[in-house]
Regions:
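Flavin-dependent oxidoreductase catalytic cores
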Residues: 1-207
Length: 207
């Protein structure tokens, strides 16, 4: 069924279709089942796999527990790349240190960050420097300008301000005035212009 779904998508668009998978489910032997599963879904024509480096436990664990149990198995993902060298393999699961994770690119094609950058999005400003040797640094003032544009565009589209702003507060974790900034951003009494005007006060933007 997974292969059929992927085949239908690849047949209906020129946009590259990818799949995100786990190493297996429940009591499956991932040494036996994983390669077979991938050989089947690759018949759909996809060329890129995002691989979460642990099994999915469908019985006995809730979604939160499934994020940490069972242990991560990066080595199995590395071997997957060895078995399928012509397929782009992107690693996902437990990645939380750019400097350490960079070494994983010797065995793989890419890294997929999830919870880590959702909780600490300001860390993304380090990506170009660490992974691409860029000499440019994104300062917080530039990010505030980008937030202003993003808020205004989404406000014009009618999206909920709360759903947008609740992720923005994480940009300022670790800043001296993070609590004050969080209160400003999440305030129901301030419009977008007022929020941005306050955030542009440089004394607040101290890491």
């Amino acid at each position: 069924k997974v292969k059929d779904c992927l085949s239908a998508m690849t047949a209906s668009t020129d946009i590259p279709i990818t799949a995100k998978i786990r190493l297996g489910v429940d009591n499956q032997d991932i040494e036996e089942t994983l390669d077979n599963f991938i050989e089947i879904i690759l018949q759909s024509g996809i060329k890129t796999l995002y691989v979460h480096a642990r099994k999915g436990m469908l019985e006995g664990l809730n979604p939160k527990e499934n994020r940490n149990i069972p242990p991560l198995n990066y080595e199995r993902v590395y071997r997957l790349k060895e078995d399928f060298p012509d397929i782009e393999i992107i690693l996902n699961g437990g990645l939380s240190n750019f400097l350490e994770d960079k070494n994983k690119l010797k065995m793989l094609d890419g890294l997929m960050y999830g919870r880590y950058v959702c909780e600490k999005p300001y860390e993304l400003t380090k990506v170009d420097k660490i992974f691409y040797q860029s000499t440019k640094e994104t300062d917080i003032e530039t990010l505030v300008m980008m937030m202003e544009k993003y808020l205004i565009e989404n406000q014009n589209l009618g999206f909920s301000g709360y759903l947008i702003k609740r992720h923005m507060v994480n940009f300022f974790k670790g800043f001296s005035y993070s609590k004050k900034i969080r209160q400003i951003i999440m305030s129901d009494n301030l419009n977008v212009d007022e929020i941005i005007r306050i955030l542009k006060k440089k004394h607040l933007l101290v890491a």
